[in-house]
Amino acid sequence: LMASNAYYNDALEKAGVRDLSGAIESLKISLRFNKLNIDARNLLGLIYYEMGEVVTALTEWVISKNYQPKDNLASRYLDEVQKNQVRLDSVNQTIKKYNQALLYCKQNSRDLAIIQLKKVLSLNPKLVSGHQLLALLYIQEGRYDLAKKSLRNAGKIDANNTVTLRYLKEANAA
């Protein structure tokens, strides 16, 4: 239990300086030590939500609520998301458009993928993975300034994301 709480506290510190990826790792370790650490699970959901990963956030909150049905902040988080139909519709559109962008990437249609990702990010501007994929496509196209802009946007959400930092290093080296 002490180890779980220590990793939870570490995650709080990391989240406080927008190291969301680092906070996620600490929270996952915390939950390995104690899967019933409701505060850790709820914070993990909040961080996923902040990173635009709404479905993953909802999953964590549902698990949390199953472990502790009463007096659980997850109930409030779930209610707030579920009663906002516009937000739920936006999440569904984001998922569809992001998956379409991935399909375009697999088909080597980078221009269509870029257009689709711009739509995704207009619906969900905090989707770190969307900014990263857009930047990767820009790097492949040799459009390094646009890649850096997209990566800076991702960095504002999650300051120490290793994928973002690796892509930024690549874009700066070009």
Region annotations inferred by a language model:
Residues 1-6, 81-96:
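TPR-adjacent "capping" and linker segments in tetratricopeptide-repeat scaffold/adaptor proteins
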Residues 4-5, 38-39, 72-73, 94, ...:
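Helix-start (N-cap) detector for alpha-helical repeat units in TPR-like alpha-solenoids
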Residues 16-17, 50, 67, 80-87, ...:
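Register position in tetratricopeptide repeats
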Residues 28-32, 63-66, 121-122, 153-156, ...:
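Conserved structural position within tetratricopeptide repeats
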